[in-house]
Amino acid sequence: MSYDLALGYLVSQNKQYGLKAIEILNAWAKELQSADTHQSEDNINFYMPYMNMAYWFVKKVFPSPEYEDFIKRMCQYSQSALNTNHGAWGILFDISSALVLGDHALLHNSANRWQEWIFKAIDENGVIASAITRSDTSDYHGGPTKGIKGIAYTNFALLALTISGELLFENGYDLWGSGAGQRLSIAYDKVATWILNPETFPYFQPNLIGVHNNAYFIILAKHYSSPSADELLKQGDLHEDGFRLKLRSF
């Protein structure tokens, strides 16, 4: 909610939106001192990017030392060192933290880590091996529904990488044309092909989950060419748009 309110403020300059956004962020800063479970650590890793970006939108008019201290406390829970979807979101967590804190060293390190993650997690064919086997059972990478969430988890990781790449691009690190960027473009075309023609997905089965969670294509289409992705964008069936990419461009 803080992200939507802050974005509303950014677009409309209605201070009521900004005040409500900072109220929510400050409440989190006051109440959450540490993470006591693995699930809470995961939640911090996945949701702090939205909160940090919300603060970034309102910081100039509504600065909050309390929220900035909160970020510093929470940074220890970033999972950016992992070569999984958790790691991709951890990189976005780190980048968003670096931007709001003005931490140039963290931003520089995150730019390097973004490239490293891509080379380690995405193969030369554009496949994220740790994602495509995901099932919907407690046997995360096996069982009778092995791969049913494979496209969904691929989308989830690529969403974080895409937002990270664009934030880096707008803040002095143009990596879209780098070797890692080219590897990302292959992954973009690969997942677009799977979404457009699900039967080509290695673990194709009825009722694949999260196939069209690809609103992030809106950004990648600015930098890369993919006929399959272009067709999907034309169709407009784009979901998982938590960053409201349909309403704004970074």
Annotate each predicted stretch with a short phrase:
Residues 1-172:
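Aromatic-lined, polymer-binding surfaces characteristic
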Residues 22, 178-182:
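Short, charged, amphipathic alpha-helical segments
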Residues 172-178:
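Short conserved catalytic/interaction loops centered on acidic-Pro-aromatic/His motifs
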Residues 103, 181, 225-229:
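Short, solvent-exposed helix-helix connector turns and helix-capping sites enriched
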Residues 163, 167, 171, 186-190, ...:
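Terminal, non-catalytic domain-edge segments
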